[in-house]
Regions:
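Short, solvent-exposed loop/turn elements at domain surfaces
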Residues: 63-65, 86-88, 230-231
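Asp-based phosphoryl-transfer active-site loop
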Residues: 75-89, 281
């Protein structure tokens, strides 16, 4: 029988053959070392099935003696961003950026001043803005995110993200990253996994800060993407202009499509929080071998927000986690992360 090595390099054969390890104090030391190792990996997690699922997955897929071993080149993990890696309520961060960009856009195009939905945004009436339709928001996004050189967009987005603060915490949006998920990113990378963001948000927008905030380089961000047009400036220097042409809608089925297009491998692990992530988790779970699929359930109104409507939580238009999705997670053996019960703390500043 082949000896199976444990996480500390101690296999069954050496355990049974080493007299020193048969003593109670020695066994207690081994048990204590295992517990300390587990707690040190993702310390912002409470002990429980969710934490254990992550640790068991990493141990099994990185242990060469395990039948579940995954070669390093196949170790890919994908993460949704909004509601999975950082706060998405009361509104998606990029949508807020676009709304705040409207005055600058109207200053360049005065003809938009009396046109809807720009007129409503300029009024500052939050109640009226909350009633804007999806078509209205799409029109605002096109006006504020396209028609400019890529470098200009990046500069404007960077300037905004470095100063914009959340209305509840009065902190930068980039400070409202879930510490438990940051630890998972780091834990996976420490064990040879490449981590990717696969988001319904704008690909170029997230790439502005992904390296600094998540340790994920821009080339490992897959998001909703618009076209670009090649051209030359007055001095003959080549540049790209962002065009109002949708290339990839990275929501729902667009997520596995984007993964295939831009990554080229099926993930071994996938993390999300809403119906828009369902197909990414399905696609991940349909592969051979060991897989890890996890969904964050926002059930902590005291520390963050509570919304579903799964399990009787309040309904929402932002990051909906439906009962149907919850039931599928149970059926397909995905792990549901309870923000309230599984996370010791939410943010690094706590």
């Amino acid at each position: 029988m082949k000896a199976i090595a444990g996480p500390l390099g101690v296999n069954r054969r050496s355990l049974l053959s080493a007299p020193a390890l048969l003593s109670v104090p020695a066994l207690l030391r081994v048990t204590s070392a295992l517990a300390q190792e587990q707690n040190s990996q993702i310390p912002s997690w409470n002990d429980g099935p969710a934490k254990q699922a992550i640790i068991d997955f990493v141990r099994a897929t990185t242990d060469r003696a395990s039948a579940k071993f995954v070669p390093p080149e196949e170790r890919i993990a994908t993460f949704d961003q909004d509601g999975t890696l950082w706060v998405e309520h009361p509104m998606y961060t990029q949508v807020l950026y676009c709304l705040e960009r409207v005055p600058a856009v109207v200053a360049q195009k005065p003809e938009l001043k009396e046109r809807e939905p720009f007129k409503t945004v300029l009024s500052g009436n939050r109640e009226a803005m909350a009633k804007l339709s999806l078509h209205d928001l799409e029109e605002i996004l096109v006006a504020t995110l396209t028609g400019m050189p890529v470098e200009v967009f990046e500069g404007e987005a960077k300037k905004w993200i470095e100063t914009a603060k959340h209305p509840r915490w009065k902190r930068l949006y980039t400070e409202l990253i879930y510490q438990p998920m940051l630890e998972v990113l780091q834990y996976l990378r420490a064990n040879g996994y490449r981590t990717y963001i696969v988001t319904g948000g704008g690909q170029d927008f997230v790439r502005v800060y992904s390296q600094q905030v998540y340790g994920i380089p821009p080339e490992q961000v897959v998001g909703t993407a618009t076209g670009t047009k090649y051209g030359y400036d007055k001095g003959g220097k080549p540049f790209l202009t962002k065009e109002p042409k949708l290339l990839l809608n990275d929501n729902d089925a667009g997520k596995p499509e984007g993964i295939h297009l831009e990554i080229g491998r099926r993930p071994r692990a996938a993390f999300g929080n809403s119906t828009g992530d369902r197909q990414m988790l399905e696609y991940t779970g349909a592969g051979d071998g060991t897989r890890l699929m996890m969904l964050v359930l926002h059930d902590d109104a005291q520390r963050e927000y509570a919304y579903g409507p799964a399990r009787g939580l309040p309904d929402t238009k932002v990051g909906a986690f439906t009962q149907k999705l919850y039931d599928q997670a149970m059926k397909d053996r995905w792990t549901v992360i309870s923000m309230k019960n599984d996370w010791k703390r939410l943010f690094a500043f706590e």
